[in-house]
Amino acid sequence: MQGFGVHTSMWTMNWDKPGAERAVAAAAHYGMDFIEIALLNAPAVDAAHSRALLEKHGLKAICSLGLPQNAWASVRPDRAIEHLKVALDKAADMGCLALSGVTYGGIGERTGVPPTQNEIDNVATALEAAARHAKSRGLLLGIEPVNRYENHLLNTGWQAVALVEKVGAENMFIHLDTYHMNIEEKGAANGILDARKYLKYIHLSESDRGTPGCGTCDWDEVFAALAAIGFTGGLAMESFINMPPEIAHGLSVWRPVAKDESEVMENGLPFLRNKAKQYKLI
């Protein structure tokens, strides 16, 4: 995945036909190279419809998800494998290039103690099986570290490297997120430098998940680090504008983070594109 993309939460978290049509058309209007589809209910998605939409508008796509509680890999690796296989099949049928996100667990998965070796072993077992299935469908499989308040298993770039190397699948990659890095890493560059060997995708998300350039993220440090490692992967803007209550609860989004999607797309996107150009990433 290369170029600039956007998470479809900008317009919808419900990937039904109306939601897909709105998001794909809007992403194309703003000149995106790809979109990231929140695959929260894979069985309900009309893959042929989505594939046709993407082809019509000339967009590539990646899918992302978090595992539901009954399929958390740390405690139910068998259920996680089953859930991921269904999602991978749907992503492949849509013509997507990868499945990423919190593929190892769920938003809100916390035990109150650090992850145990048994939990990490279970996660690795699930991801190994999922990576094999992904490879059979021509897909990459990513893992996204998130902050300590959303999950206790994977919070930093170096933890993601350790998990990728434990699984040992050649089609696995690391997917970082500046919002989570702003909480967990010792400086914006650290996670990028730690994950450099496997880093193929990054969420560009402001400190409040609103409009990039209007918060506390050190964007110069982020883009300088990406330039330093010769990053050629996907740059995906993520801002949580249209959140259904059940997802907003899990992400602790209690108020609007921006006026509307136009504010983010017309101010945040040019800001990020200019930074990428400044550091010769596009």
Label each PLM-derived region with a short phrase.
Residues 5-8, 35-36, 64-65, 100-103, ...:
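Short beta-strands and strand-loop turn motifs
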Residues 11-12, 68-71, 106-109, 147-149, ...:
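A short, flexible beta-alpha/helix-coil linker loop
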Residues 17, 76-173, 183, 255-266, ...:
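Active-site acidic/histidine proton-transfer and metal-coordination neighborhood
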Residues 21, 33, 37-125, 232, ...:
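Structural motif corresponding to the early beta-alpha repeats
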Residues 47-58, 126-134, 191-194, 221-226:
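Catalytic-core regions built around general acid/base machinery
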